[in-house]
Amino acid sequence: MSAVRIGPYTLLNGLILAPMAGVTDQPFRQLCRQLGAGLVVSEMVTSDMSLWNSRKSRLRMIHEGDPEPRSVQIAGGDPQMLADAARANVELGAQIIDINMGCPAKKVCNKAAGSALLKDEQLVNEILQAVVAAVDVPVTLKIRTGWDRENKNGLTVAKIAEQAGIQALAVHGRTRADLYTGDAEYDTIAQIKQAVSIPVFANGDIDSPQKARYVLQATGADGLLIGRAAQGRPWIFREIEHFLRTGETLPALQLSEVERILLEHLAALHVFYGDVLGVRIARKHVGWYLATLPGAREFRAHFNRLQDTEAQCANVREFFSERDKSPETGQEKEVAA
């Protein structure tokens, strides 16, 4: 995988943390970058600036301290509102603006945003033209292969994007109707890669170093967008980068290393969100980290009732201490990839 450029920025590698609402907040972005991601993208920010006064929106728009280049995803269906939102985020420190035309969630699509936009190619063009003209930073785009299997217009949208001045394109290998079911279709991504000259990033079902290599070979993509597989496993970027570079698989992480990363992540969440919201946000992340370990279900039932930061950290330490002593986890005390 050769070096990838997005406008003036050369990425450390072509492995990108996909934007995920409720997941890719600043603590998670910073952690994934530390653990090997070449670029990390913010949670989706609505283009409706009248909603920016909520605490959730304000937290999503904190870019100071983010690893550079700072990529911020915006979502909406009105060209002028998206252009204004892009301009405002650049003023707040965004160095790359990413437009969401890939989210399949009903609450997004029902507002004629996300992958719903793929139904209207003229509107797609108007949005891309408006946002590119509004800012002097690179604009990127995330799409799906189409609205449904009968309307797979990803190739057409990719060409529209290139002509509009989009500087990189991420393609999830499913239609909006597919949601996350079935297998990702990499042949369509390969066709898109052949049809445009801008960088193309493949997305969908990339959950191991071996799968990463397969997808790169199958699509010819310039890089990979990794989302759900990084939840509870932010070191997947390091694993994939090492495998692609050397052909060798890194040893599974020691439990002690998983504990260290998780506690660091917890502390960052508690600081970023404050004690009350931080405790709530931490619960899902802890569930993801521990999902494959024995006793995790019982632990989560107890952990999710905890109400303060110190108790959360103490319980995580206790969980790992018990696993460390347990023969169930094996002599090496490693976490399977």
Task: Indicate where each model-derived feature is located.
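Active-site beta->alpha loop and helix N-cap motifs at the rims of alpha/beta catalytic domains
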Residues: P69-V139, R144-K152, A161-E162
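Alpha/beta catalytic cores of nucleotide-metabolism and tRNA/nucleoside-modifying enzymes
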Residues: M1-A3, G7, L11, L15-I16, ...
